[in-house]
């Protein structure tokens, strides 16, 4: 009976989607890059075809679904290992506002309209562009905003120390055990300086997952071996 077959196929397709979710990992829609979004839509389309298209044999759809999941998994795995590949699929964040000035060339590249930019700022309770030090369009399409010091909410730290008026974006120095030489050159930093800073901390480049020069001049370093017990996400 065709109705019973559709029910079975629907349950099977839902089960395949759950398995795919377990393999590919947890991610919300708001965190998706363009690649993630395309992959999710394609998997959904294949699963939908398995559910209602009775003219196609179930095992053919299952094979197609499995191959696509495997392809996505391999690309994601390689992207974690290789920063250039990750940038190819996910892209780079784009600065849209710098020191209260809109960067029109970047807006055009991203096909980002002023109306949408103003909407995103209003959602963050910003009604004056001059309050913005940096506005960055992330790879997942979200807009992150850093206000100028005089327009930020007061914190306990602000009440204890004076605000440093000189502000800049953090500078990524090392990612996945590799020095980001382009960032060093653009910011007039040298590799010898970076290596010396790591030596002071008794850390090697290959041991470093992520190192960034913060806006206040401090260097944040995260190592592969943190020796931290994570209580969450254990099954």
Swiss-Prot record:
Keywords: Cell membrane, Membrane, Transmembrane, Transmembrane helix. Its main location: membrane. The keyword Transmembrane applies. One of its GO terms (cellular component) is plasma membrane. Pfam families: DUF421 (PF04239), YetF_N (PF20730). The keyword Transmembrane helix applies. The chain crosses the membrane at residues 32-52, 60-80. It is found in: Cell membrane. InterPro entries: DUF421 (IPR007353), UPF0702_alpha/beta_dom_sf (IPR023090), YetF_N (IPR048454). It is a multi-pass membrane protein. Belongs to the UPF0702 family. This is UPF0702 transmembrane protein YdfS. It comes from Bacillus subtilis (strain 168). The lineage of its organism: Bacteria, Bacillati, Bacillota, Bacilli, Bacillales. The gene is ydfS.
